[in-house]
Amino acid sequence: IVDIHIVSDEYKLVSKKWKAKPTSIDLGDNIFIKDGEMAVITGPCSIESEEQIRAVVAHCVENDIKMMRGGVFKPRSSPYAFRGLGLEGLKLWYQIASEAGIKIVTEVMQTSQIEEMYPYVDVYQVGARNSQNFNLLDELGKVDKAVMIKRGISGTIEELLQSAEYVFSGGNEKLILCERGIRTYE
């Protein structure tokens, strides 16, 4: 073999070659995520209490931050670690955040959670551990909400784009790719 030429990209729909139009995601209330503009999302790793939610929402309001992240369903390395407040915690968070005009970004870990979370979430987050959960990505392709995919722990850029392709090919073009850093073996 002297030379190799790729005839077809594995991520046609999300490639700038095929979709040159800049992305603009409308989250409502005049809050947009756009190409070329930095979007700040702040918040704790996990949502743990009403007091914590109120404190972080107040911080967001004081600093003109429109999006808050946090986990109500947490994938933990240890089965004994706190795994989040679940759906009831999300409902409480939504009530407090929506009163302040703050959008919610939170992780969905399995397909069965998508529908129950839908009324309370503005951006579904696919965490690093689930960035190649193809059943989850397929189902998120069918929802009319933004999806933020974090790059996998040891994932390549190509794998991140292929994960995005699953969501996009299902019809959901409201995609955010999150570069979270990776673990290498160098």
Label for each model-derived stretch:
Residues 72-76, 130-186:
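Conserved anion-binding
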Residues 50-58, 112-120, 157-163:
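Catalytic cores of alpha/beta
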Residues 69-87:
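Glycine-rich, proline-tolerant flexible connector loops at the mouths of alpha/beta enzymes
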Residues 33, 57-64, 95-99, 118-119, ...:
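Acidic (Asp/Glu)-rich catalytic clusters
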Residues 1-40:
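Non-catalytic terminal accessory/regulatory regions of metabolic enzymes
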Residues 82-106, 139-146:
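Alpha-helix-loop-beta-strand connector modules within alpha/beta enzyme cores
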Residues 38-44, 66-70, 104-106, 124-126, ...:
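Hydrophobic faces of well-ordered beta-strands that scaffold small-molecule active sites
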Residues 38-55, 78-84, 103-107, 127-128, ...:
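Active-site mouth loops of central-metabolism enzymes
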